[in-house]
């Protein structure tokens, strides 16, 4: 086994200067569960990429990702989380997950405030739905708080569009499990309150509209020769193009962190996104070279990647071990 590098960010404040107590304890990236196109590439030829749904396996992975998220949060009752894990994870040994390294919960303060950013692609929204269902179940069992059935997050709604309830505190593209949506019960212990935002900048890399499987096989061979980061798909994007979207979104995050200095900061920020976007996000944040980016292979569906704030060094540390192409680290994908 080769020694894994520890990835530490150089600057958590971006170009907005240093600030304290305004940054989330964790930044978590979650890849969507298995989609129909992960199972059968032919669907890319007749279903728009943004409308591809999860498979039944992907729906299971979405709920398991909810368990994995709860496991890294500072919650009231970790035993309750493990009880839920027994319900949603039948065989831990059969799962393809990413290991955590040196995650010791540097802060023990309870996590009660989460913001989710989701790719608007259907498979990402459906993954988020599975995650939120698990959190809602934890909230109901732990603190007696239940969300009204007709006010739960719905990734579909009518036709192509998600359903976004519009309460007093809600605007288009934002969903909250706030007091407007609570049907019964009062917070008894730690009530995990969350906010959901649709964010087009964290969408999948554009592979070029409808994709015929035979032609895409040839394109993929060319990409392998050219290089995964700079190769641009016909009528689509390169990973370098995705990098530009990542840079824009991270600047938005830094502004949000800065603006929350006068208010309670988010305890946890979660991005429900895609495999390539997740790796490019980490590349930009930790300032990897393109060669370092290309050394990492894709993460399994439903994977949870954890960045933890280490206030002693004023930096975020990547606590998840990512899989690489090299043989000595090949076992990290299991």
Curated annotation (Swiss-Prot):
One of its GO terms (biological process) is intracellular sterol transport. Present with 3170 molecules/cell in log phase SD medium. Substrate binds at residues 38, 44-45, 108, 168-171, 195-205. GO terms for cellular component: cytoplasm; nucleus. PROSITE patterns: PG_MUTASE. Keywords: Cytoplasm, Hydrolase, Lipid transport, Nucleus, Phosphoprotein, Transport. The active site is at residues 32, 126. This is Broad-range acid phosphatase DET1. Its EC number is 3.1.3.-. It is found in: Cytoplasm; Nucleus. Belongs to the phosphoglycerate mutase family. It comes from the Eukaryota. Optimum pH is 4.5. Active from pH 4 to pH 5.5. Its main location: cytoplasm. The modification Phosphoserine is found at residue 248. GO terms for molecular function: acid phosphatase activity; phosphatase activity. Transmembrane segments: none annotated. It is an enzyme of class 3 (hydrolase). Metal-independent, broad-range acid phosphatase. Involved, either directly or indirectly, in the bidirectional transport of sterols between the endoplasmic reticulum and the plasma membrane.
